[in-house]
Curated annotation (Swiss-Prot):
Belongs to the PLAC9 family. This is Placenta-specific protein 9. Keywords: Coiled coil, Secreted, Signal. Pfam families: PLAC9. GO terms for cellular component: extracellular region. Its main location: secreted. The keyword Lipid metabolism does not apply. Residues 54-81 form a coiled coil.
Amino acid sequence: MRLLLCALAGLALLRAPGAFAADEPFIPSRGDSAQSTGCDTYMAVHSRLDVIEETVEKTVEHLEAEVKGLLGQLEELAWNLPPGPFSPIPDLLGDGDDRF
């Protein structure tokens, strides 16, 4: 499951190269510059992680819907398949005699 999430996160990064760019230019706040730079970096990382999390969640929801649809189609196909060579012959007369 962790591998799937890593792959989905990688796909999200590849599909949206401009989604992680800052919307506003970086303007340092007044006060202690070392503390504000660290805080700004922390906030920027958090906002990027929020975007990645949202993208991964949407991708997972989309993939769940696709898998559900594919499973529905497979079930429908399984019900419509003719019996195979090793399938039991249906007892049409209902007498339970399986000699044939």
